[in-house]
Amino acid sequence: MSSDLLCGSHAAPVVTQLRRHAPLVHCITNDVVQNFTANVLLALGASPAMVVDTDEAAQFAAIADALLINLGTLTRPQQQAMRAAIDSACAAGKPWTLDPVAVGALTLRTEFAQEILARRPAAIRANASEIRALTGESGGGRGVDATESAHQAREAARLLARRTGAVVAVTGEVDYITDGERTVAVEGGTAMLTRVVGTGCALSAVVAACCALPGDRLENVATACWLMKRAGEEALTVSRGPGSFASALLDNLHAQAFGGAYETH
């Protein structure tokens, strides 16, 4: 399966739309990453909100421009709020994104992820092991970490996209984004992104924000991946370790959104 390579010149129009529309993203995400996720969205010009009560989640999902469902610290009571929010978003015509953290490794979240896939997410952002688990392959990573490369899960991602109608982003050293017919690759980034808690979960929130934008959803989701990788590369050049890298990542995401300079490679 061949993949087209996304470069900065293709990402630039999507970044402009992100800044212009400033989508309101309803994040039902895990307890570990809420603050960092909110700051990443703000850095890019989007607006985050974390509404978790079941009744309020349903109300707010209809108001927001996009919804993120992240299974990182899933509990049975939280499932009710997630179902209500997804149903409300779907009824209002709002896109929702699934981040199926650690599916395949744990039973509760794996069964719940399979259940809500029937509600047709606009996008799915996951690592290789999670993508393979969603398709019923062996899957099952080491907790939240993948035990396979994104390249190994490209075909599973394509099949999952065809089955669900979602744009599927399988992320790793190289990210692959597919709608089941077309596939885009995003290269770059840095291993330091794996040394800061929440970068993957925050990326899923950016994917959700980009799903609210007009235009080609495949390119929109690929641009979300490009933004995180590019900002990570730039942050690495000015940081001394994970702590300073996290701050520099936010600064460089903001620079990508508001600086207006995009390389063609």
Swiss-Prot record:
Catalytic activity: 5-(2-hydroxyethyl)-4-methylthiazole + ATP = 4-methyl-5-(2-phosphooxyethyl)-thiazole + ADP + H(+)
Binding site for ATP: 125, 171
Pfam families with a match to the protein in the record: HK
Swiss-Prot/TrEMBL cofactor(s): Mg(2+)
EC number assigned by the record: 2.7.1.50
Binding locations of substrate: 50, 198
Protein's GO biological process: thiamine biosynthetic process; thiamine diphosphate biosynthetic process
Family indicated by similarity: Belongs to the Thz kinase family.
NCBIfam families reported in the protein's UniProt record: PRK09355.1, thiM
Described function: Catalyzes the phosphorylation of the hydroxyl group of 4-methyl-5-beta-hydroxyethylthiazole (THZ).
Protein name per UniProt: Hydroxyethylthiazole kinase
Underlying gene: thiM
